[in-house]
Every structure is written in C-alpha cells, then in structure tokens.
C-alpha cells in the first residue's frame, strides 16, 4: 500500500492511502489503539449515516469506543460545538491515555485535531479523512476552529499519529464536494509543478472524471508536496505560507458568506484567480489565465465574480488573515508556475486587482 512519511519537526508519521486503506492497516492499527484507555471518535452527521458501520467493523474488538456526531459543515467549527465536544469528553471520563479519531472531511479533521490538542493539554489523535479536500487539511498538523470574524483564527499546530486515507469513501461524495477538494489539488500544482498542472488539465476535463479517473496518484503527489514543505517549516514561519495560495482572498470570501455560502474549495478557486491576476500585474506571470478559467468552467466551477460583494468587507476580512502582520496584508503570488513568493500588498493594489478581476468576469459569485 502506498505510504508517505511526513517528517515534521515535532513528529514523524505515516500517511496510508489507497482504496482499501482501512482494511489494509486494520490489524496493525487496532493493536495500537488497544493500548489506549478509551477510543473517542469524532465525526459528523453525514459521515456517520454513510460510513459509521465501516469504522465500527474495524473497531469492533476494542473494549471502549465512544462517538460524538457533530453538525455537518463549517457549523462544526464553532465555539459552541467545541465546548460541547469537550463536555462530552469530560463527562465520559476520558483521561490522558485516551485517543481521538477524527473521521470525516476537513472540518472534522480541524475540529478533532484542535480538541485533541487542547483536551488535558493534548491527547493523541488519528486522521481518517473521507473527502478529497481532506488530503490537504489532514496532513501537516494545522488544527483550528473559526471565529465569526475570521476562518481558523483559534488553533494550533498539532500532528496526528497517522493519517489513514481510504479513497473508497469518495464514491459517496456529491459532485460539489469533489470539486471543492479538487481545488486544493490545483493549488498544489500551481505552487509546485507546471507538469503536474498540465497533467491535471489533460486528465480531468469534465465533472464525471472526478469519479471515473484515478485520483490517487494526484492525491499522493499533493500530499508529497505538502509533506516536503511541512518538513522545512512546520509552524508557517516561512515557506509553509506558500500553501495559502488563493487563501487570503478565499478565506475573506468564506467569512463574508458566514462560512456557509461557499464551500472552502469554491472560495479558494476565486482566491486563486484573484492571486493569479495580481501575479500577472506584479511579476508579469506568463500564464494563460483564460485557458485556465475555461478549464475550470468545464469542470463545473463558477469563475465569475459578483459585483454585489462589497470590496470593503473583503478587505476588512483580509486584514484578519493570519498572514497579516503590522497591518500589512500578505499575498502568496507566483513569479512563475511552481515559484511562489510572499508579497506585501497595499490597499490600492488589492482594490485595483479586484477591479481587474471584475472586468474580466463579474456577476457570478
């Protein structure tokens, strides 16, 4: 079974990925889990309905397993749900020898990791992602919940014991969720590898390809790209910020939509178009943005921007971005495909880029 090793400064751990990963690691994993005093599984309503029975079968021989089922979507990454999970842990009597399993998409991984990082100052946890989007969020140790004023504003860096990535869960993902996760695959290609980007564009040309073409080698490559960056910079003091390409604008848009109007990958797609447009203006990026947007449209993405979204709100939310320091907004831009840079953007440039993007396609958000 394909295995990728993540070598962060704080911990080294494996990422197991294939269509039957849970079955393939079952014996070894349950032996490890049996050493803990209690297994606590955090999932959401959707995943519990579709896949709980599969995880139950894997955990069947363990004596003490407790589930917490969170709401679907970004609603799970709130103070209210975080407190409720903590209350459940305390009432259940979990001690420091317990372990948490985050079983779901990126939201559950973020919430579960943050719960594990903060309960009794830290208990071990495993990531068992069920979505394409989670190939990015499950690896690297970023864990967080949202604040009404910004995405992932309350969090930590806390690495899992392992990531068990069973791709057969993708079969039940709606097309919109598949597309959202695929956006992070595009991001990895843009910041690292022109050849990878071309392979994505040649392989995936319509929405049905998400289900009929093999995603696994592209997911593996994306995880390898992220693992290499995390090995250099676990806590985002330098090159790890490159993984935020498209996220400064994208997170601002998510916050404007109250973390519900757009899925993460949808917002990041707008953010990547925005960042590519600024990269053309600042660095003369040699990139066929028109071809790129046409490809995105073929895959079902909406690439046009809505003039009714007030720029003032987007700018305000960008100021709350974690990369903003000394009131200077940091953008991840591209000098060329595969060559990201950090650029301190003035308000005038941010607005001019917004206007340029609007001129090239509006009224769609």
Swiss-Prot record:
Its cofactor is Co(2+); Zn(2+); NAD(+). InterPro entries: Dehydroquinate_synthase, DHQ_synth_AroB, DHQ_synth_fam, DHQS/DOIS_N, DHQS_C. Its main location: cytoplasm. One of its GO terms (molecular function) is nucleotide binding. NCBIfam families: aroB (TIGR01357). It is found in: Cytoplasm. It comes from Listeria monocytogenes serotype 4a (strain HCC23). GO terms for cellular component: cytoplasm. Binds 1 divalent metal cation per subunit. Can use either Co(2+) or Zn(2+). It holds the Pfam family DHQ_synthase. This is 3-dehydroquinate synthase. Zn(2+) binds at residues 184, 247, 264. Catalyzes the conversion of 3-deoxy-D-arabino-heptulosonate 7-phosphate (DAHP) to dehydroquinate (DHQ). The keyword Iron does not apply. One of its GO terms (biological process) is amino acid biosynthetic process. It catalyses: 7-phospho-2-dehydro-3-deoxy-D-arabino-heptonate = 3-dehydroquinate + phosphate. NAD(+) binds at residues 106-110, 130-131, 142, 151, 169-172.
